[in-house]
Amino acid sequence: NHGLFTWADNAYDCYMNSLEVIERCSEYLEEHVAQKPVFGGQKVTSLAAEDRKLQAATLAPYLRGLCSSEQLMVGHFTDSDRVLEFINSHALDKLAPMGTSCPDHFLRTKIRPLVLNFTPDEDVSDAEKVKEKLTPLFEDYRASYKDYYENHKHPNSPAMRDANPVVILWPGVGMFTFAKNKQTARVASEFYVNAINVMRGSEAVSSYTSLPLQEAFNI
């Protein structure tokens, strides 16, 4: 869960060892990725790029409003091929709730994302209907986060932080991330893409295992 350690007689050789091991691991994973459908294959078909941007731009203000229930948040959106490969897949429902496997990822993205039960071409033009559908999803996420906190806290644990999601996934459209400023939201997006890469490689050679909840909380 923490990374790679390599050893040598000096710093340069140690660095070169790290690069070599990383390259060999990358080649090994890609060989296995090519042997079967990634994430079990695609379940959802993405909208065209222009339509994805339009859907995201329409929904983003509603998501931002709900994510800002405790403090003002700024959003970031990405619909890269790697993100779409994951959020459109058959494995999304299994992998997304499991959470991330690396402490660095978890600290930036929270324990798990919120997955929207919207179709890619969902009509998001009616404000009241959109809020009516989104609000229960956020309420469930907040309740789940509160349960996670209550079940794993220690006597000296700090107060529960903002219970709203950082990462929000919309199959067929893309990924939103929310944080206190644009840079932090963008970094959260990059970290979740890294988490996707970990899940992708793990599922190619074996089965993905997330960070144990208590260990995640202790971080």
Give each language-model segment a name:
Residues N1, D9, M16-I219:
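Domain-length cofactor-binding catalytic modules of enzymes
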Residues T6:
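Catalytic cores of glycan-processing enzymes that make or break glycosidic bonds
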